[in-house]
């Protein structure tokens, strides 16, 4: 019986740490950082193997063309940003072949991962899980915002090559760096549009949350990240 009229699940309580800046900097988490890529490759390969039959009571969206879906959301905001439009043009022109349709977490990144001192313990925040291209999760890990100031291209910890090789071994999928970079740029644009959307919600008083207002101010950060990423691609 639902206590609030909505579906919910009860999960086991697991002790650990989620704060990204601690994971990236504190010596307590040295081993967790060392194991991060292999742990993530195993976790994502397992997530991407899940099938619709595993969720008989959940209506999960299938996103076969996420770029078009994101552009529709952006257009509906009616708040033009030239950097975002440049990114949309580049993404359309350089779109890679689809990897396939898999179960996708949708927000796999530091901050949504629970660590013990020796590695990954749990993956949190499943509310935007859906079926789509598994590369979406890999690219999202690489978005500059989710590096939290770390030096590595992947979550501030590691590099593209190590991630792709570890994921290949665990999943059997071979993904090129060019494809991963496309999904990273898509993820950066997606986060920028989300920030734009949240800022609009605050300005139009659909919400008065200061947290939402603060996220809305991060549009400029994402524009800067997009310009850096596009310059690396020769734009």
Residue ranges and their predicted role:
Residues 1-98, 119:
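ATP-binding pocket architecture of kinase catalytic cores
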Residues 18, 55, 113, 131-133, ...:
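Conserved protein kinase catalytic core
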Residues 32-36, 100, 159, 176-179:
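Conserved acidic
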Residues 36-40, 66, 80-83, 107, ...:
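An acidic site on a long C-lobe helix of protein kinase domains
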Residues 47, 89-142:
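Active-site acidic catalytic loop and adjacent metal/ATP-binding pocket
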Residues 58, 174-186:
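All-alpha amphipathic helical-bundle segments outside canonical DNA-binding/catalytic cores
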Residues 136-173, 186-205:
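Active-site activation/catalytic loop segments of kinase-like enzymes and analogous catalytic loops
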Residues 213-235:
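Regulatory N- and C-terminal appendages and interdomain linkers associated
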